[in-house]
Amino acid sequence: MLSEGEERALLDALDDEFKAWTTYDQVLRDFGPARPFVNIVDAEARHIEALREVFARYGLEVPENPWTGRVPRFASLREACEAGIEAEIANVALYDRLLRSTTRPDLLFVFRNLRRASQERHLRAFRRCASRGR
């Protein structure tokens, strides 16, 4: 059985992944299949699925995505990439906090993997995108 803090951590993680997926999906709707969004939106879907598996393991109800129709729109791909940088930095900070909320190996494994994806892959991709001006 999860503690209240662990449940809150899972909900916070899922909410953040929903927000990222919905934001990056909106960028693709607005600008077409632009890199790095076309790759990262797929990664965000995998992150959501990883969290859904944890929810199922503990018998928790998976909430609906609250971000549909509520994410920002950007004037350019560069602006979207700059926002992606900020979002991924915030995501790393979120997972730093969530990693302190549990000692459960399965939660730590998922939180570390999702943090690593933001820090080592998504953040780098958005920085490259912003530096290209697209």
Question: What residue ranges belong to the model's regions?
Answer:
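All-alpha RGS (Regulator of G-protein Signaling) helical domain and cognate RGS-like helical scaffolds
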Residues: 1-134
